[in-house]
Regions:
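Binuclear metal-dependent hydrolase catalytic cores
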Residues: 4-6, 13-201, 267-285
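Cap/insert and terminal regions of metallo-dependent hydrolase folds
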Residues: 205-286
């Protein structure tokens, strides 16, 4: 029994399970997976007893919005939601090769610290792509990951390599990522992303004139669709549906959905080719 061994003996015992040098992970190549499809407070929302928040339908349980692309050279994570660890464990995804951010709001960045483990698997800092305003928020919220003070041990803080992005397409993990400028209410700019004929556009209230052409000829559009009623910084269900019908992709999925948006009830009234997304939904990139 270990409980009866003296400390000198315990110090020389090694665990039977070796340290894993390669991650235990599912191959998601050629897929876009919606890790989270919920609004900033998630669904169920704390203290809410509405039929959706108390629903037993797992498609009504929505973690904070995030997604991951399985690209030719690895997994590209979109945003680090506060639920990131839970999301990756649920999907059995054990490694992130790069991260790209839509914007700087807390429900999209506060899982940043969960990137710590990936430096061990990659053997290098995790490449992170973001606009300057997002970098500023990361440096402020996670100052310990950026200061000059030596860490006590490897893995004590996230190890990342920042890359600034703005509007020009970029190459990440063997694919071209098209950046789509979007509006998130009167004060905030966000980025959507297009890879091939699939586009991911969350936290949207308006598509600027110059961005419509970037969203033509899509197979799949993932688009903000917060709730039935209008909102200052998000698309309502009617607004999102109108945009989808104008762009006419083969399939649209709404994300960043609030409670009271029952999965089955909303889908029953949406036009053909438009549905609510749900946590864990897999979309083909080909």
């Amino acid at each position: 029994m270990l409980a009866n061994l003296p400390a000198t003996r315990l110090a020389n015992i090694s665990p039977k399970t070796p340290v894993r040098k390669q991650p235990y992970t599912t191959d998601i190549s050629g897929k876009l997976i919606l890790l989270g499809t919920g609004t900033s407070v998630g669904v169920p929302a704390l203290g809410c007893g509405c039929p959706v928040c108390t629903s037993e339908n797992p498609k009504n349980h929505r973690t904070r919005s995030s997604a991951i692309f399985g690209l030719p050279e690895g997994n590209l994570l979109v945003d680090t939601s506060p639920d990131l660890r839970t999301q990756l464990l649920r999907e059995k995804i054990g490694i992130v090769h790069s991260v790209i951010y839509t914007h700087e709001h807390s429900d999209h960045v506060m899982g940043f610290d969960d990137l710590r483990l990936f430096q061990f698997y990659l053997g290098t800092p995790v490449p992170v792509y973001c606009r300057k305003i997002v970098e500023k928020r990361l440096r402020k919220a996670f100052d310990y990951a950026f200061d000059d003070q030596p860490t006590t041990h490897q893995g004590a803080t996230p190890s990342i390599a920042l890359h600034s992005i703005d509007r020009e397409p970029i190459q990440i993990l063997g694919e071209t990522v098209t950046l789509i400028p979007l509006r998130h209410g009167p004060r905030f700019d966000v980025l959507g992303f297009r890879i091939g004929n699939v586009a991911y556009c969350t936290d949207v209230s308006e598509i600027p004139n110059d961005s419509w052409d970037l969203l033509q000829d899509l197979d799949t559009l993932v688009l903000d669709g917060l709730r039935y009623e209008p909102h200052a910084t998000h698309l309502s269900l009617a607004q999102a549906t109108e945009i989808s019908q104008r762009l006419a992709p083969r399939q649209t999925y709404f994300t960043h959905c609030a409670c009271r948006m029952d999965y089955d009830e909303v889908n029953a009234v949406l036009p053909d080719g438009i549905e609510l997304g749900y946590d864990g939904l897999q979309i083909d990139l080909v």
